[in-house]
């Protein structure tokens, strides 16, 4: 064992200060990066929702698979301290690479605001995420155990309080990061053009991880550093493998059956190890249904965040970003854990109900299932507010009069009269085969026929400004703007080209009496500048939008005033989101309550039922259930392809209820044990065996005393 001089502070080893600060910074780094990851995939890399969800959950699964590797390295090779330092360096590099991958100007050679070589960003992102998964997962089983190693015998009370402080540091880091990094994301930054500031939002977590590493290394001289004692997981695997191989080797009836399949390892392994593995496998068997809970729980960062992008973030005077809704879980967990421990559980006990650990976990599954039912109800309400878009062989038309004359528009079954600078109330839907001709006219003028080839499944805007002057514009917006952003396009009624710059994005060379394509912006007031060679120098070229909310689309008409200066008129194409993000709070509340009675209880149950030297084995098994849960999401998201998102939520809720019933049946037949008593019995037996070997008269003397 590597020892250093012990320093204490109020009875606690001073070294744990460095470990707690390290954990706070590391959790800030991890959860801060993870909070914005799904929106980075959809907004910056432009993956669709299903692929983004799949990559997100693949990453999370890797983060919970690599703890096994970290435990192996620490126990059999480097020890906990060197493992934490080595993998923290890998972790920091991964965060830095991810931040670099999000720099738009890295490949934006033509300075148009979009990457010219998206594969470069994708490859860098995946390399960064792989390094992060190796780093965060590898140190996960080491840091808390290393903190526990710092205490002396007789400091059990301080050690227990340390784990409470450690858990608080985790939640504090998670809470702050999920508030701060989304705020950094919505800032505008860039060298040649301005975009959502992902480099800063990823860069701050990278800096915090570097701080975590530095703080941890600074405490090096105060730590107790135990040398690797051999990997118990390897011994467990070898014993199980030998038992299975030996059992199949003696399949014939000539060999008598043994009480337990692990008893076939007795030829090579001692009774104590076999008994300990039996305890572990009994708990591991109960772990089989548990991944389904995590399949639902970890969708907070994917599906639920994407759901929030279709909602309004205005809550009173506050404006909540979609990825900030995850802070609700972190806030509620800090509130609910003490309420459950100090109020709810004692109240249940006073009522005479034996609320065992496994019963609590089953209740947690039910609560998580209910949370997804609530999420489905919220999704149905969201779907009701969505505009109707053309399907199949349908086409939608909106007419916008950008001239100074009253115009009459004749469509199949529709006759519309529009005054100057006005539009139809909504998009009109037609069968594409029947929309062969649109007639436009004004009082005293001949009729002009519009016979353009309207593309099926598309929205079109018919710009008219005189009886024989029109322009058909394909909108290119056949769904609500994604990620809660707002679509803006401009129509030029000048007789010359104009260029408009808005928040770093350029609408270049919009031709006369034509429309630009939509560009997309986050919520807020956006400034824009109109430039043209024909605008007099005394004119004010700078304008502001009104306040953009979430998920809207607008057409801005640029027209000339009597003094030849430009002015702007606005028409709504798609209304803003109206279902408020606050409606997600009930589903977060139910899921958080489920987490308290499932996750916290599950860890306590695993610890209490594990032999002293195999608690790390069960910890690795517990983390493995999280990884498998994320793999389940991958399978469902990849294979389901539901046309309605609420249906996927209901499927997950139903699957978890079925799994809960199976788990309840399995738990019914589980017998709680006290590993300490079993190990004490082995200690007593081994002590007797040693006495027998050293004193052959030990048993005979004892027997003679019994006879006296």
UniProtKB/Swiss-Prot annotation:
Effect of residue 594 to V: Abolished peptide transporter activity
Protein's membrane topology: Multi-pass membrane protein
Cited Pfam families: PTR2 (PF00854)
GO molecular function annotation: dipeptide transmembrane transporter activity; peptide:proton symporter activity; proton-dependent oligopeptide secondary active transmembrane transporter activity; tripeptide transmembrane transporter activity
GO biological process, alphabetically ordered: dipeptide import across plasma membrane; monoatomic ion transport; protein transport; tripeptide import across plasma membrane
Extracellular domain (ECD): annotated span: 383-584
Sugar attachment sites: 50, 404, 408, 439, 509, 514, 562
Coiled coil: none
Catalysed reactions, as listed in the record: a dipeptide(out) + H(+)(out) = a dipeptide(in) + H(+)(in); an L-amino acid tripeptide(out) + H(+)(out) = an L-amino acid tripeptide(in) + H(+)(in); L-alanyl-L-lysine(out) + H(+)(out) = L-alanyl-L-lysine(in) + H(+)(in); L-alanyl-L-proline(out) + H(+)(out) = L-alanyl-L-proline(in) + H(+)(in)
Main localization (coarse): membrane
Effect on the protein upon substituting residue 595 to D: Does not affect peptide transporter activity
Sequence ranges on the Extracellular membrane side: 22-53, 104-118, 183-198, 298-327, 383-584, 641-645
Cytoplasmic side: 75-82, 140-161, 220-276, 349-361, 606-619, 667-708
Keywords for the protein's UniProt record, in alphabetical order: Cell membrane, Glycoprotein, Membrane, Peptide transport, Protein transport, Symport, Transmembrane, Transmembrane helix, Transport
SUPFAM superfamilies named among the record's database cross-references: MFS general substrate transporter
Localization terms from the record: Apical cell membrane
Tissues in which the UniProt entry reports expression: Expressed in small intestine.
Bilayer-spanning residue ranges: 1-21, 54-74, 83-103, 119-139, 162-182, 199-219, 277-297, 328-348, 362-382, 585-605, 620-640, 646-666
UniProt keyword Cell membrane, yes or no: yes
Domain notes: The extracellular domain (ECD) region specifically binds trypsin.
NCBIfam families on file: 2A1704 (TIGR00926)
The protein's assembly and partners: Interacts (via extracellular domain region) with trypsin.
Protein's job: Electrogenic proton-coupled amino-acid transporter that transports oligopeptides of 2 to 4 amino acids with a preference for dipeptides. Transports neutral and monovalently charged peptides with a proton to peptide stoichiometry of 1:1 or 2:1. Primarily responsible for the absorption of dietary di- and tripeptides from the small intestinal lumen. Mediates transepithelial transport of muramyl and N-formylated bacterial dipeptides contributing to recognition of pathogenic bacteria by the mucosal immune system.
Protein name (record): Solute carrier family 15 member 1
Origin species: Homo sapiens (Human)
């Amino acid at each position: 064992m590597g020892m250093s001089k012990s320093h204490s502070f109020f009875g606690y080893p001073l070294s744990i200060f460095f470990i707690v600060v390290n954990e706070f910074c590391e959790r800030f780094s991890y959860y801060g990066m993870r909070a914005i990851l799904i929106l980075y995939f959809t907004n910056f890399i432009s993956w669709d929702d299903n692929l983004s969800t799949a990559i997100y959950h693949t990453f999370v699964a890797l983060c919970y698979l690599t703890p096994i590797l970290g435990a192996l390295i620490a126990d059999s090779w480097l020890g906990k301290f060197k493992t934490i330092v080595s993998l923290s360096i890998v972790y920091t590099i991964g965060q830095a690479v991810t931040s670099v991958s999000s720099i738009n100007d890295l490949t934006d050679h033509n300075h148009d605001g979009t990457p010219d070589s998206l594969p470069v960003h994708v490859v860098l992102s995946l390399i960064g995420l792989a390094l992060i998964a190796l780093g965060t997962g590898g140190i996960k089983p080491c840091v808390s155990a290393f903190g526990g190693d710092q205490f002396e015998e007789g400091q059990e009370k301080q050690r227990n309080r340390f784990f409470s402080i450690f858990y608080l540091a985790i939640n504090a880091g998670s809470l702050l990061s999920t508030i701060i990094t989304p705020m950094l994301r919505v800032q505008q930054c860039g060298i040649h053009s301005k975009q959502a500031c992902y480099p800063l939002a990823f860069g701050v977590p990278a800096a915090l991880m570097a701080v975590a590493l530095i703080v941890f290394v600074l405490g090096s001289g105060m730590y107790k550093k135990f040398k690797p004692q051999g990997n118990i997981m390897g011994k467990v695997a070898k014993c199980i493998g030998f038992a299975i191989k030996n059992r199949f080797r003696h399949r014939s009836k000539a060999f008598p059956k043994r009480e337990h399949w692990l008893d076939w390892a007795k030829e090579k392994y001692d009774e104590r190890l076999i008994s300990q593995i039996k305890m572990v496998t009994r708990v591991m068997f109960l772990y089989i249904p548990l991944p389904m809970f995590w399949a639902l729980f970890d969708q907070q960062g994917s599906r639920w965040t994407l759901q929030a992008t279709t909602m309004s973030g205005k809550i009173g005077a506050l404006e909540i970003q979609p990825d900030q809704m995850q802070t609700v879980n972190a806030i509620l967990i800090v509130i609910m854990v003490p309420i459950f421990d100090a109020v709810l559980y004692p109240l249940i006990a006073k009522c005479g109900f034996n609320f065992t650990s496994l019963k609590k976990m089953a209740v947690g599954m039910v609560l998580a299932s209910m949370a997804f039912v609530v999420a489905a109800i919220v999704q149905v309400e969201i779907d009701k507010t969505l505009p109707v878009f053309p399907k199949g062989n349908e086409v939608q038309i909106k007419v916008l009069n950008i001239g100074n004359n009253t115009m009459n528009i004749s469509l199949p079954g529709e006759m519309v009269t529009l005054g100057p600078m006005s539009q139809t109330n909504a998009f009109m839907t037609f069968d594409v085969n029947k929309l062969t001709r649109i007639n436009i006219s004004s009082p005293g003028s001949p009729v002009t026929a519009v016979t353009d080839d309207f593309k099926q499944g598309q929205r079109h805007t018919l710009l008219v400004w005189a009886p024989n002057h029109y322009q058909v514009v394909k909108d290119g917006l056949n769904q609500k703007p994604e990620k809660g952003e707002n679509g803006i396009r401009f129509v030029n009624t000048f007789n010359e080209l104009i260029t408009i710059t808005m928040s770093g994005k350029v609408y270049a060379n919009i031709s006369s009496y034509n429309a630009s394509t939509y560009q997309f912006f986050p919520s807020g007031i956006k400034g824009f500048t109109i430039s043209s060679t024909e605008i007099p120098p005394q004119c004010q070229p700078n304008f502001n939008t009104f306040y953009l909310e979430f998920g809207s689309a607008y057409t801005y008409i640029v027209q000339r005033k009597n003094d030849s200066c430009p002015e702007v008129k606005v028409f709504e194409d798609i209304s803003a989101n109206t279902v408020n993000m606050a409606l997600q709070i009930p589903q977060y509340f139910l899921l958080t309550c489920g987490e308290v009675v499932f996750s916290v209880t599950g860890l306590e149950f695993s610890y209490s039922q594990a032999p002293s030297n195999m608690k790390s084995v069960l910890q690795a098994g517990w983390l493995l259930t999280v990884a498998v849960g994320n793999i389940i999401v991958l399978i469902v998201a990849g294979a389901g392809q539901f046309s309605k998102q609420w249906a996927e939520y209901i499927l997950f809720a139903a699957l978890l209820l079925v799994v809960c019933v199976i788990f309840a049946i399995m738990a019914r037949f589980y017998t709680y044990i006290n590993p300490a008593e079993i190990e004490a019995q082995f200690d007593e037996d081994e002590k007797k065996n040693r006495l027998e070997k050293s004193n052959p008269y030990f048993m005979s003397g004892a027997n003679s005393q019994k006879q006296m």
